[in-house]
């Protein structure tokens, strides 16, 4: 352990705060274990405008040497909204926003333009797009349910019920009472090239694939808590789920095309932190997880059936949670070419937690490229040999060199003015201008394989074989409105016959077809996550290979990253066994037959490997032989200023689910677990139960509706002005009105990112080891990932949607508006089930603080004093808020002067939630109990 920790000596992380309390720079120190020099500082800078808006970021590499090249620059509106953003990696984006902050038009460096149309309620109606030299095409149209009886019977009122998008038409026939779809259908466009949606629905349908068999309908049934009880996919295959009292999966079953029900998983056991400890798969394999009682890290992951040990992974960590070894004790020690080959992987990191070396096992035929190594069949671990890989990175985090045992080193050339990189070719100068488009998308995968991109910077096509004057071999992709792939088509020419290999991705189902004029193979891949195992059932409608049993079940046993290590059949016999290099390349794979392993589609990190050699991650494609993404991060700076870097060069510990959640194991998470005493139950939505995600979505939706209503009320006139006086003081609150409108608009725009944008997965779910801990949520104001940490109490009760909405407004205001916690209102009023009773209670609590009643001034002084003592507020901030930083003057003013109290309340996070509920709470009347008489509109306090 001494060797592990010595590299971190004299390498602190420093944060430089300007007099306004803004983070001006971050300094980290880089050192490797074999370094003989002093640690090298690397400085990341943030530059702000006079009002405090972030206008530029500088990274350590591009700003080195005194010639500062800004990695990202921004031009902001007067209210702080970003109008123009420019990245050295991703090019520029220009947005035109309306008075509500919604984007109406958008342009980029490729000459693409997008126009957005909204209705009076702020809902999108249509999206038009055009390229630099192409026509305007309406590529999306939205249709909503009205309020008539034919809509209310299906819970369609106000819901998006038909969406003509980039792949076809998505329609929802029924919604449940909780807003989840009960029945939805997908139809695909006949042609891959979008010709634009006409306004008439019949004309739209004419552009879709004809026939009833081309309407793919999925159905669900939910519990009262929103848990999925039954899912019937588009081919009629059904999955059934059962949960325990805590909402955790207890068992799952599968029914294939009206045949007998098959048990997929059962006997699941969880520990006090909600983490799974044991489960039994349908093939009899018992999986067990062992956690370290000191830090809750997983130490052992095993799977066995009877006396057969199928998997036994033992993990060892450094003090901050980096994995330093993985020992598979289910595998034997072997000998190859006079070398002892142990089934152990070892890892070493630099002071920035970047992986710099790894050892493990490989097959001799493995290479550094997009292809797979030769299959070992039958399974024979004795054919594996040792390997050593080492990596070097530049100051910007670009992987510039990979050395591999006795093979030639692999180098990357990085552009001097960006992070765009190309494989080094000896004797050839890299042409970054010709290899990337203006938006930073790679145009050539490998020599001879061109790539084409959509207006939304999604990979549209890869030319696999170019034939002048003849049809190319290619693979093409279609995406839905959310940016997720829903269709893949590969065409290949052989013996003058064009064959098509196509995949349609539907909820829980992949329909894979292959053929020339007609499909001679039709395969349904039925997918479900049954506890630990990712279960896939192969159901052939046509063309089943004779070597594969009918309706073959495949259980995938994964490692800690979710990579598919073993595939087992229904008798727990081995189908395939695979190992991976740290950056995702296949180091070796074994299987019992060539035919069976052909149908292994999911590999590294649980992602699908395309014929191109790229892994599809949901929003981007990853090239494992390059160790980087092939296009910039669509969320821009959510995970640093290098938009091509993969999981911060720590692929052993960090996992990118969709390219959305970031920050695993960083300094904030360490503080959460080791200082604050919480245990992290899950990161992002994918690691939570459906019921938890549903409650979170309800809270976000409620908060967004309240913010929208608050802005509308404040802008409409003076009807709610006295509500402002209730919160901030009589005759004072009205003066805050213009500033409040701007700040609520900023909050509303930020909530869009948490509902459907780049921050959708930036939630961390916690369990407190202290039973009496009443905390619901918190944030770290300087967190570059803008995460919201939620305790289990915040998302465990469907009756507390209102509490959750106010909590989310409170926490996000810290991140967006730099608010403080000067005062907390009592939560007693929130328990009132009557809307008018709630308003009366909130009004009373607001006046307690604004009028200085019930000792509230003393509470404010105590909170303020604690913030100063903990250095959570600077003297400069105090002067900006109150005009003085003298605590005695502040205490005296808050006790006696309403103006002092009003300033404290104006910058108080809880006051933003309180004001929103008092002014815009009418948007949530449906959350309260129904009275026999219609509930009247809330009367303003004139």
Regions found by a protein language model. Name each.
Residues 561, 621, 808, 812-817:
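Active-site His/Glu-centered metal-binding helix of metallohydrolases
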Residues 555, 577, 645, 802-807:
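Active-site alpha-helix of zinc metalloproteases
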Residues 199, 545-618:
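A motif-centric feature for acidic-aromatic and gly/ser/thr-rich catalytic loops and repeats
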Residues 25, 39-61, 172-183, 401, ...:
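Carboxylate/His-rich catalytic cores and anion/metal-binding grooves
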Residues 33, 63-82, 89-90, 125-161, ...:
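Acidic/glycine-rich beta-solenoid
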Residues 387, 572-589, 598, 613-614, ...:
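Short turn/helix-capping motifs enriched in Asx and small/polar residues
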Residues 1-44, 49-50, 200-203, 214-217, ...:
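Thioester-forming pentapeptide GCGEQ
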Residues 661-806, 815-942:
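Predominantly extracellular/secreted Zn2+-dependent metalloproteases
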């Amino acid at each position: 352990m001494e060797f592990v920790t010595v590299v971190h000596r004299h390498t602190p992380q420093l944060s430089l705060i300007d007099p306004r309390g803004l983070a001006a720079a971050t300094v980290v120190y880089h050192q490797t274990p074999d370094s003989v020099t002093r640690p090298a500082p690397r400085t990341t800078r943030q530059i702000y405008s006079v009002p405090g808006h972030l206008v530029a970021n500088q990274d350590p590499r591009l700003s080195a040497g005194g010639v500062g090249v800004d990695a990202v620059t921004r031009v902001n509106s007067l209210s702080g909204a970003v109008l123009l953003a420019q990245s050295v990696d991703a090019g520029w984006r220009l947005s035109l926003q309306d008075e509500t902050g919604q984007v109406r038009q958008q342009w980029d460096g490729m000459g693409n333009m997008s126009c957005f149309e909204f209705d009076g309620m702020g809902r999108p109606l249509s999206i038009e797009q055009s390229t630099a030299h192409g026509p305007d095409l309406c590529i999306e149209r939205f249709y909503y349910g009205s309020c008539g009886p034919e809509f209310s019977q299906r819970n369609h009122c106000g819901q998006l019920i038909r969406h003509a998008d980039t792949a076809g038409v998505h329609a929802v026939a029924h919604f449940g009472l909780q807003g989840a779809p009960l029945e939805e259908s997908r139809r695909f466009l006949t042609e891959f090239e979008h010709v634009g949606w006409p306004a008439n629905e019949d004309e739209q349908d004419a552009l879709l694939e004809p026939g009833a068999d081309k309407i793919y309908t999925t159905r669900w049934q939910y519990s009262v808590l929103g848990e999925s009880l039954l899912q019937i996919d588009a081919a009629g295959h059904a999955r059934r789920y059962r949960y325990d009292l805590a909402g955790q999966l207890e068992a799952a079953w599968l029914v294939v095309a009206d045949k007998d029900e098959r048990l997929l998983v059962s006997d699941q056991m969880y520990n006090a932190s909600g983490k799974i400890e044991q489960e039994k798969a349908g093939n009899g394999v018992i999986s067990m997880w062992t956690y370290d009682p000191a830090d809750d890290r997983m130490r052992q992951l095993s799977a066995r059936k009877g006396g057969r040990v199928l998997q036994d992974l033992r993990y060892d960590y450094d003090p901050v949670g980096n994995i330093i070894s993985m020992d598979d004790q289910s595998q034997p020690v072997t000998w190859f070419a006079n070398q002892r080959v142990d089934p152990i992987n070892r890892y070493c990191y630099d002071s920035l937690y970047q992986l710099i070396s790894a050892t493990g096992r490989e097959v001799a035929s493995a290479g550094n490229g997009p292809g797979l190594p030769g299959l070992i069949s039958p399974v024979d671990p004795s054919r594996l040999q040792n390997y050593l890989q080492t990596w070097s990175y530049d100051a910007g985090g670009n992987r510039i060199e990979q050395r591999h045992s006795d093979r030639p080193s692999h180098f990357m050339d990085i552009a001097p003015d960006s992070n765009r990189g190309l494989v080094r070719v000896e004797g050839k100068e890299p042409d970054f201008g010709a290899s990337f488009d203006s938006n930073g998308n790679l145009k050539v995968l490998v020599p001879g394989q061109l790539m084409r991109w959509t207006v939304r910077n999604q990979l549209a096509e890869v030319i696999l074989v170019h034939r002048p004057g003849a049809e190319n071999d290619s693979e093409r992709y279609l995406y839905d409105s959310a940016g997720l792939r829903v269709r893949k088509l590969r065409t290949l020419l052989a013996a003058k016959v064009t064959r098509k290999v196509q995949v349609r991705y539907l909820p829980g189902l992949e329909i894979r077809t292959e053929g020339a004029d007609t499909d001679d193979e039709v395969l349904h891949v039925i997918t479900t996550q049954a506890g630990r195992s990712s279960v896939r059932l192969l159901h052939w409608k046509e063309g089943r290979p004779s070597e594969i049993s009918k309706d073959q079940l495949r259980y995938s046993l994964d490692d800690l990253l979710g990579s598919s290590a073993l595939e087992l059949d229904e008798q727990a016999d081995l189908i395939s066994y695979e190992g991976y290099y740290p950056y995702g390349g296949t180091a070796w794979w074994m299987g019992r037959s060539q035919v069976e392993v052909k149908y292994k589609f999911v590999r590294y990190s649980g992602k699908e490997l395309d014929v191109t050699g790229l892994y599809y991650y949901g929003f981007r494609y990853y090239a494992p032989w390059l160790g980087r993404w092939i296009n910039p991060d669509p969320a821009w700076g959510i995970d640093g200023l290098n938009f091509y870097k993969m999981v911060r060069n720590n692929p052993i510990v960090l996992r990118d689910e969709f390219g959305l959640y970031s920050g695993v194991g960083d300094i904030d998470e360490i503080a959460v677990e080791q200082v604050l005493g919480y245990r992290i139950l899950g990161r992002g939505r994918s690691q939570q139960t459906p019921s938890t995600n549903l409650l979170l979505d309800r809270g976000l939706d409620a908060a967004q509706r309240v913010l929208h209503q608050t802005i509308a009320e404040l802008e409409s006139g003076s009807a709610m002005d006295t509500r402002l006086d209730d919160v901030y003081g009589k005759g004072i609150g009205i003066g805050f009105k213009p500033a409040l409108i701007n700040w609520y608009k900023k909050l509303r725009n930020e909530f869009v990112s948490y509902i459907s944008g780049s921050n959708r997965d930036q939630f961390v779910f916690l369990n407190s080891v202290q039973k009496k801990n009443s905390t619901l949520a918190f944030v770290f104001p300087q967190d570059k990932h803008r995460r919201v940490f939620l305790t289990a109490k915040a998302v465990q009760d469907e009756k507390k949607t209102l509490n959750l909405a106010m909590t989310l407004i409170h926490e996000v205001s810290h991140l967006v508006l730099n608010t403080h916690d000067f005062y907390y209102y009592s939560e007693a009023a929130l328990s009132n089930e009557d809307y008018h009773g709630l308003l009366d209670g909130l009004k009373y609590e607001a006046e307690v603080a604004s009028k200085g009643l019930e000792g509230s001034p003393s509470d404010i002084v105590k909170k303020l004093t604690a913030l100063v003592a903990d250095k959570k507020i600077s003297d400069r901030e105090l002067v900006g808020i109150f005009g003085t930083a003298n605590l005695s003057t502040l205490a005296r003013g808050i006790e006696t002067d309403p103006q002092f109290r009003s300033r404290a309340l104006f910058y108080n996070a809880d006051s933003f939630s309180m004001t929103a509920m008092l002014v815009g709470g009418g948007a949530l009347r449906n959350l309260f109990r129904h009275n026999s008489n219609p509930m009247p509109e809330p009367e303003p306090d004139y």
